[in-house]
Every structure is written in structure tokens, then in C-alpha cells.
Amino acid sequence: KRAIQSEKRRQHNASRRSMTRTYLKKVIAAIASGDKAAAVAAFATAQPIMDRMATKGLIHKNKAARHKSRLS
């Protein structure tokens, strides 16, 4: 039972981590393209997701803070 739960949790966490990375890539791509409006919008959607992942323990809170600080 423990192994099954572990595997299920691992897959769930992997999908969440992937989603977080995707949002970060969208922000970076918007900044690189020079489109300020798109960059601001992408950052606004990525920010609460980073906070949520930090709260749930998927990423460290300092890592979330570092990403937000560097992207803002």
C-alpha cells in the first residue's frame, strides 16, 4: 500500500513541478520577446502558482521567492 501511495504522490508532484516550470518558461519567453504587457500578465499568473507550490512543500519557499524576485 505504501509503495502505491508513494508512486501516486510522485506522479502528482511531477506533474505539478512540470506545470510550475512551464509557467516560468512562459514568463521568460514573454520577457525575451520584449512584449511588456504579455510579460506582466504571465508573471501575474505564475506568481500565485509559485506561492502555492512553496506552501505545499513542492519547492522551497526561498526558491519561490528567488524566482519571483528575479522575474519581477
From Swiss-Prot:
Keywords, ordered alphabetically: Ribonucleoprotein, Ribosomal protein, RNA-binding, rRNA-binding
One GO BP: translation
One Pfam family this sequence matches: Ribosomal_S20p
Function field: Binds directly to 16S ribosomal RNA.
Family, similarity comment: Belongs to the bacterial ribosomal protein bS20 family.
Keyword Ribosomal protein: yes
GO MF, one annotated term: small ribosomal subunit rRNA binding
Protein name: Small ribosomal subunit protein bS20
Gene Ontology terms: cellular component: cytosol; small ribosomal subunit
Organism of this sequence: Aeromonas salmonicida
Source species, domain of life: Bacteria
